[in-house]
């Protein structure tokens, strides 16, 4: 549930490498 400081409107989360995932056009970790 922690914002990763990245949006995923046009491209996937680069921060998915550290466990972030796309939710509501923003990348979150848990």
Swiss-Prot record:
InterPro entries: Cyclotide, Cyclotide_bracelet_CS, Cyclotide_sf
Entries under PROSITE patterns matching the protein: CYCLOTIDE, CYCLOTIDE_BRACELET
Sorted UniProt keywords: Disulfide bond, Knottin, Plant defense
Disulfide links within the chain: 4-20, 8-22, 13-27
Record carries keyword Disulfide bond: yes
Gene Ontology process terms (BP): defense response
Cross-link (Cyclopeptide (Gly-Asn)): 1-30
Post-translational modifications: This is a cyclic peptide.
Family, similarity comment: Belongs to the cyclotide family. Bracelet subfamily.
This protein's domain notes: The presence of a 'disulfide through disulfide knot' structurally defines this protein as a knottin.
Function field: Probably participates in a plant defense mechanism.
Protein name: Cycloviolacin-O5
Source species: Viola odorata
């Amino acid at each position: 549930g922690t914002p990763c400081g990245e949006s995923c409107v046009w491209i996937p989360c680069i921060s998915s490498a550290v466990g972030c995932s796309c939710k509501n056009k923003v990348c979150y970790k848990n």
